[in-house]
């Protein structure tokens, strides 16, 4: 029986070694997968944080854009209303000007008849166009500065 006992003992030792090797192999795989899982979880967390940050920035930029777009539209509407009022005669466009006097031969000497200062129609249109463009540029510049100060720092 000692020979049978030796064979059985050898078989049991082989089975134990084989099972130990299998357990060690699967344990190493489990550790490797855990490391991969943890790494991917960290990367996912960072990606989600970046997405959240970008979404927040997009909302901020959209709100900023809406604010300055509204201000620009309001300024243009005010400029158009002013232009319409001047064209309809409800308001007058006052420009500091000096008129040259016109001397007439029939008037007494030393009395001047000055013509009232007035812009030519094209100059008036150009004034309002320039005013509108200045307002547009100012609002665009303010919006860009606000964007740079809030988003690029």
UniProtKB/Swiss-Prot annotation:
Its EC number is 3.4.-.-. GO terms for molecular function: peptidase activity. The keyword Nucleotide-binding does not apply. One of its GO terms (biological process) is proteolysis. Keywords: Antimicrobial, Bacteriolytic enzyme, Hydrolase, Protease. Pfam families: Phage_lysis (PF03245). Necessary for host cell lysis. It is believed to code for an endopeptidase that cleaves the amino-carboxyl cross-link between the diaminopimelic acid and D-alanine residues in the murein component of the bacterial cell wall. Encoded by the cryptic lambdoid prophage DLP12. This is Prophage Rz endopeptidase RzpD. The gene is rzpD.
């Amino acid at each position: 029986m000692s020979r049978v006992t030796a064979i059985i003992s050898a078989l049991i030792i082989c089975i134990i070694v084989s099972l130990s090797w299998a357990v060690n192999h699967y344990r190493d795989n489990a550790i490797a997968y855990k490391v991969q899982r943890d790494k991917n979880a960290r990367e996912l967390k960072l990606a989600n944080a970046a997405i959240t940050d970008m979404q927040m920035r997009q909302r901020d930029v959209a709100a900023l854009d809406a604010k300055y777009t509204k201000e620009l539209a309001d300024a243009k509407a005010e400029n158009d209303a002013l232009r319409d009022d001047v064209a309809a005669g409800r308001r007058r466009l006052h420009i500091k000007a000096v008129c040259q006097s016109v001397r007439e031969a029939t008037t007494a000497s030393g009395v001047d008849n000055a013509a009232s200062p007035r812009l030519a129609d094209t100059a008036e249109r150009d004034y309002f166009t320039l005013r509108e463009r200045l307002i547009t540029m100012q609002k665009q510049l303010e919006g860009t500065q606000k964007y740079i100060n809030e988003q690029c720092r």
